[in-house]
UniProtKB/Swiss-Prot annotation:
Gene3D superfamilies documented for this protein: 3.30.2300.20, 3.30.70.2810, Vaccinia Virus protein VP39 (3.40.50.150)
EC identifiers of the protein: 2.1.1.186
Keywords carried by this UniProt record: Cytoplasm, Methyltransferase, rRNA processing, S-adenosyl-L-methionine, Transferase
GO cellular component, one term: cytoplasm
Subcellular location per the Swiss-Prot or TrEMBL entry: Cytoplasm
Gene: rlmM
Subunit composition and interactions: Monomer.
Protein name: Ribosomal RNA large subunit methyltransferase M
Binding site for S-adenosyl-L-methionine: S188, C221, P222, G223, G224, D240, D260, D277
Source organism superkingdom: Bacteria
Family per record: Belongs to the class I-like SAM-binding methyltransferase superfamily. RNA methyltransferase RlmE family. RlmM subfamily.
The organism of origin for this protein: Salmonella arizonae (strain ATCC BAA-731 / CDC346-86 / RSK2980)
Record's keyword annotation contains Metal-binding: no
Length: 366
């Protein structure tokens, strides 16, 4: 199998294509990207027959910024007969996947696909039963086996394939299903909540998002991101000249500092988290984040980079490379991840975790 489907935000197909072409090429898995604007997906076609499977195995999915999900597929199945769509799909998957742990019948995240989504939901149950009978799926769901994907691009027209359990998005269509909390001050709260789900393994939440931690929110007004930290029982310094929501102030967990986020310097050395969603040029935000990390002012950070209208992949890559260079220069070992989240628009969200550093007073780094 030589094709990989990558799901992305509609309107960002070119960025997704540029990224996969660049990163696959660096691993000598050469190919070309098929792109149609505003379709919400890209197909990367490798020149060598088995390179699609190699790509989803060797390139860490966590290293991709613009892809929400990916899976390797065979040829496009077209003109599926309405009276029996199941038989051709089962035939395509037999011999390709054995004992898959889960079935996902998906579409791209576009308005045009909403009707198709209703069909996918109904179609999943009989298709799952047929795939189990054929040995393509196990008789019970298991997260340790490959996930079988059936991706409809139009009625009667789909790609079939699989993703690897250890190297994909665990979410259907790559989108965590989150509900907006009615007491949150703004919808931006969902960005940070999604980032926590995407970047931090659930079994590490109790340790890395623990009660009683200290956190800083730069550019906090009115408090959408502060809300997520307060909800996890942290003590939060919310830095912004604009006012914070009274509901957050009433918790007693928030200290509002009327300062410019770019000028603020913390006065304590046990800050676990710094978050930042300021509308500013990406280079300026990246430089500020580098300063916080190099000086050991926080252990982990999540921040947003607003994207320009053109060369968006290049802009993000340039800023992440600058951040990595600053950390390397100052002997800071850190893990950097970036993703355009479902709740992001013209922006990407970056997570950095300091693992250890040669900064005095921070011997607790691990």
């Amino acid at each position: 199998m030589n094709k990989v489907v990558l799901l992305c935000r509609p309107g960002f197909e070119k960025e997704c294509a540029a990224e996969i072409t660049d990163k696959a090429g660096k691993r000598e898995l050469f190919g070309f990207a098929r792109v149609k604007e505003n379709t919400g997906y890209v197909i990367y076609e490798c020149y060598q027959p088995e390179d699609g499977e190699k790509l989803i195995s060797e390139l860490p999915f966590s290293s991709l910024i613009f892809a929400r999900q990916w899976f390797v597929v065979g040829e496009l199945l077209q003109h599926l007969p309405p009276e029996d769509r199941i038989t051709p799909i089962v035939g395509m998957l037999q011999g390709v996947v054995e004992k898959g742990g889960e079935l996902r019948v998906e579409v791209a995240d576009t308005n045009e696909s909403k009707e198709l989504m209703k069909f996918c939901r109904k179609f999943t149950v009989p298709l799952r039963a047929a795939l189990r009978d054929a040995g393509v799926l196990t008789h019970y769901e298991t997260p340790k086996r490959p996930v079988v994907h059936v991706f409809f691009i139009a009625p009667g027209c789909c790609y079939t394939g699989y993703s690897l359990a250890h190297n994909h998005s665990p979410f259907y269509m790559g989108i965590p299903r989150l509900k907006f909390p009615s007491d949150a001050p703004s919808r931006s709260t969902l960005k940070l909540e999604e980032a926590l789900h995407v970047f931090i393994p659930e079994d590490e939440w109790d340790e890395r998002l623990a009660n009683g931690m200290y956190a800083v929110d730069l550019g906090a007004c009115p408090g959408g991101w502060t809300y997520q930290l307060v909800k996890r029982n942290m003590w939060v310094y919310s830095v912004d000249n604009g006012p914070m929501a009274q509901s957050l102030m009433d918790t007693g967990q928030v200290t509002w500092l009327r300062e410019d986020g770019f000028r603020y310097r913390p006065n304590r050395n046990n800050i676990s988290w710094m978050v930042c969603d300021m509308v500013e040029k990406p280079a300026k935000v990246t430089a500020l984040m580098a300063q916080w990390l190099v000086n050991g002012w926080c252990r982990e950070t999540i921040f947003n980079l607003k994207l320009p209208m053109k060369k968006r992949y290049e802009e993000v890559s340039h800023n992440l490379a600058y951040l990595q260079a600053q950390l390397d220069e100052h002997g800071v070992n850190a893990q950097i991840q970036a993703r355009q989240l479902y709740h992001d628009r013209e922006e990407v969200t970056v997570h950095v975790r300091r693992l250890w550093a040669a900064v005095g007073g921070r011997r607790d780094e691990r």
